[in-house]
Amino acid sequence: MRVLLIIAGLALLSVVCYTSEMKEQNSLNEVLSAFFDVEEPQEKGCIICF
């Protein structure tokens, strides 16, 4: 019984860590996406100029 609780606790801990890591990665992707969205119109303008 005790072993089962330990395994369940470890599984829950791994799920929580994985979820927080995914949220962190998503926020990083949003920042990078916003940065490249700001930069993109300038690139399009330069391509049109040529």
Swiss-Prot record:
Entry's Gene Ontology cellular component terms: extracellular region
Organs and tissues of expression: Expressed by the venom gland.
Signal peptide: 1-19
Gene Ontology molecular function: toxin activity
Key words, A-Z: Secreted, Signal, Toxin
Taxonomy, superkingdom: Eukaryota
Primary location group: secreted
Entry's localization field: Secreted
This protein's record includes keyword Secreted: yes
Family that this chain belongs to: Belongs to the neurotoxin 10 (Hwtx-1) family. 67 (Jztx-67) subfamily.
Name this polypeptide is given: U37-theraphotoxin-Cg1a
Organism: Chilobrachys guangxiensis (Chinese earth tiger tarantula)
